[in-house]
Amino acid sequence: MDCSAMSSDQEPDYVGLAPYLYYSDATAALAWLTRVFGFTEEVRFEDGSGEVFQATLRAGDARLQLAGVGPEYWEAKGVEGPVGQLNVVYVTDVDAQHERVSAALGEDAAPEPPQDQPYGARIFTVADPGGNSWTFWQQVTDQVELPSGWREVRPEDQEAEETGEVPG
């Protein structure tokens, strides 16, 4: 693709975004993500011993990738290992998803129940065996009730502030 033909003010034509997660045991991670969250396996690539070294999963219309890497991968990058990340999964019924995850994990590992947030979402978070956090998010209202001193700022509001215009 010749990027020189794109102007600097042209919007990129994105077709998607997928997290790429690293696990020390990708085979176990793949099994856990499909069993606990109900993600659908799209494809996996196994090495000669049958261990997963890369896989693609689906969560609704979204995709995520995972890979198995050992300590030598992190040593070559000059870091001690993965630090995990937070992944947000948008759902239509967060309470039903919480029930599913809780049932799959059992009583000893069940996540905290969903909580309403001041920005109109109802969420719960659970960590996977690789140290990644997964927040399941249902937008329940457009009403935002921020704590005192907080404010919601959108790009158009920032532009108006910079030019002295009153947003309307």
Residue ranges and their predicted role:
Residues 2-20, 30-31, 37-90, 98-127, ...:
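Vicinal oxygen chelate
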